[in-house]
């Protein structure tokens, strides 16, 4: 979207605020509400945020990004904190240090695999989108002729052709991001049925109170 680095960092703050708020909420309601329902809420919020992100465009406002970031942060907070509690609830106290190390390792490996897959798909879909959009760049394109007539593009110079190619690349990258967001939305939705396989912890407070849960 062409935002400066400082603005990008500022737009990421609401997601962290949402995650922090969800963590505080989990600590308050954890003993009273089944943790599996909290994970379900988190997965649903994450899927909702991903769905909203599939509606993004190159003209998306900062408010839309901020609002979506808050929803996504709430979803992540309601997923990982209860999930950690459930994971350690049946683990003997003397195994919690080893369990925390293994839990963090698996989580980091999973995150690395997911990020790598999304980046690979992004690169592939960007190239495919660029090739598809480039097919509309020809002398008989009405939209292109109108853009040239109003001075948006200059096809008579190398600089103008480079600008046109950059715009095609920008549009292709946006489409690729939307495809990634759509895939992540389906991953979140498909993860919801697996919550039924989790056991209800007998004592959430005893598991959540362990210092070994910190990453």
Task: Locate predicted features.
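Transmembrane core module of solute transporters
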Residues: 1-98, 207-215
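Hydrophobic transmembrane architecture of multi-pass small-molecule transporters
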Residues: 86, 103-200, 205-215
């Amino acid at each position: 979207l062409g935002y400066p680095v400082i603005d990008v960092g500022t737009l990421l703050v609401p997601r962290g605020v949402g995650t922090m708020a969800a963590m505080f909420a989990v600590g308050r309601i954890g003993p009273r509400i089944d943790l599996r329902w909290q994970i379900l809420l988190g997965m649903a919020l994450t899927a909702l945020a991903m769905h909203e992100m599939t509606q993004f465009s190159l003209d998306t406002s900062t408010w839309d990004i901020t609002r979506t970031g808050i929803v996504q942060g709430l979803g992540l907070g309601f997923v990982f904190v209860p999930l950690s509690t459930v994971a350690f609830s049946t683990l003997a106290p003397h195994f919690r240090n080893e369990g925390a190390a293994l839990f963090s390792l698996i989580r980091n490996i999973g995150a690395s695999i997911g990020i790598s897959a999304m980046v690979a798909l992004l690169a592939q879909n960007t190239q495919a989108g660029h090739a598809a959009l480039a097919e509309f760049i020809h002398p008989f394109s009405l939209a292109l002729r109108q853009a040239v007539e109003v001075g948006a593009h200059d096809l008579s110079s190398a600089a103008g052709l480079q600008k046109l190619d950059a715009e095609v690349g920008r549009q292709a990258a946006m489409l690729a991001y939307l495809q990634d967001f759509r895939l992540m939305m389906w991953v979140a939705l498909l993860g919801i049925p697996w919550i039924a396989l989790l056991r209800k912890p007998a004592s959430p407070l005893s598991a959540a109170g362990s210092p070994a849960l910190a990453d």
